[in-house]
Amino acid sequence: MAHKKAGGSTRNGRDSESKRLGVKIFGGQAIRAGNIIVRQRGTQFHPGFGVGIGKDHTLFAKVEGVVKFEVKGAFGRRYVSVVPA
């Protein structure tokens, strides 16, 4: 009568899949319309000239040009713009 005592349970053993967030195109780099610039949760970066924002707060280029990051305003908001080349 070979019996095996029940193994103990554990509270570990799971992890969420990474969401691949962050800046995809950096300042000074060339970009084409429709390309993703930043994937983010909330508005860490705000859209400036030539940049649109998706429903998940993804920033994307609306025009072709060069990416520019800048800090503006009294609250020190970070803006991303696309300067036409």
From Swiss-Prot:
UniProt xrefs under InterPro entries: Ribosomal_bL27, Ribosomal_bL27_CS
Family label: Belongs to the bacterial ribosomal protein bL27 family.
Gene3D superfamilies: 2.40.50.100
Keyword RNA-binding in annotation: no
Cited HAMAP family: Ribosomal_bL27
A matching Pfam family: Ribosomal_L27
One Gene Ontology term from the biological process aspect of the record: translation
SUPFAM superfamilies (alphabetical): Ribosomal L27 protein-like
UniProt cross-references to PANTHER family, sorted A to Z: LARGE RIBOSOMAL SUBUNIT PROTEIN BL27M, RIBOSOMAL PROTEIN L27
Organism: Azotobacter vinelandii (strain DJ / ATCC BAA-1303)
UniProt keyword terms in alphabetical order: Ribonucleoprotein, Ribosomal protein
A GO CC term assigned to this protein in UniProt: cytosolic large ribosomal subunit
UniProt region (Disordered), positions on chain: 1-20
Identification of the protein by name: Large ribosomal subunit protein bL27
GO molecular function, one term: structural constituent of ribosome
Ribonucleoprotein listed as a keyword: yes
